[in-house]
Regions:
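Small beta-barrel nucleic-acid-binding modules, primarily SNase/OB-fold domains
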Residues: 1-199
Length: 199
């Protein structure tokens, strides 16, 4: 075999290996671009330590208990000091608990580049994903268990707003059981007179 033939042979072999590595990397997601505006802050799945209410949970994060506040949504109150249990609050809390429990009791947490890392109560602000990739924040809005929360910046605002509009039109969840009042700043609120309705 001449030197030229040997060189062509090795080049062909290297190209074949490179193609194989690239194909494997594509399959494993090595070259996938991250979702625009969103980064994974805690890779892996975290076990639920406690369900606080519909939009707040605590997780065991490598031996540390962290409270997680769902980004971009707000569920009716069940445990807020000096606030009565609001219409559909218990239903929203039960939906979050039952959905996560049915999925194995573990979640993946994703931060948002437009959002702060923690809120004023030192809770981590996160999108909460089920193991199958379902965004639970969005599902709560779609199913009428939560309001879209427009008061702070986050990348999925338009998606959540559209989900809320569809839930309103279909009278899903709290939109059928309660009578939320539009607030001056683009969101909705529950009047205290509705506190015990629809629980």
């Amino acid at each position: 075999m001449t030197r030229r033939m040997r060189r062509k042979h090795w080049m062909s072999l290297l190209i074949t290996i490179a193609v194989a590595v690239f194909a494997y990397g594509q399959q494993q997601g090595w070259f996938s671009a991250p979702e625009k505006g969103v980064m994974t802050s805690q890779p892996g799945l975290y076990a639920i330590d406690h369900f606080v209410d519909g939009d707040t949970i605590t997780v065991d994060m490598n031996g540390t208990k962290e409270t997680i506040r769902f980004i971009g949504i707000d569920t009716p109150e069940t445990h807020k000091p000096n606030t009565p249990v609001q219409c559909y609050g218990p239903a929203a809390a039960a939906y979050t608990k039952n959905t996560i429990t049915a999925a194995g009791g573990k979640v993946r947490l994703v931060s948002d580049s437009l959002s702060t890392n923690r809120d004023r109560y030192n809770r981590l602000l996160r999108y909460v994903y089920l193991p199958d990739g379902t965004n639970l924040n969005q599902r709560l809005v779609e199913s009428g268990h939560a309001f879209y929360y427009p008061y702070f910046p986050f990348t999925k605002k338009d998606t959540f707003k559209q989900a809320e509009q569809q839930a309103i039109a279909a009278k899903k969840g709290l939109w059928g059981a309660c009578t939320p009042t539009p607030s001056d700043d683009g969101g909705y609120k529950m009047e205290e007179t509705q506190a015990q309705a629809g629980n």
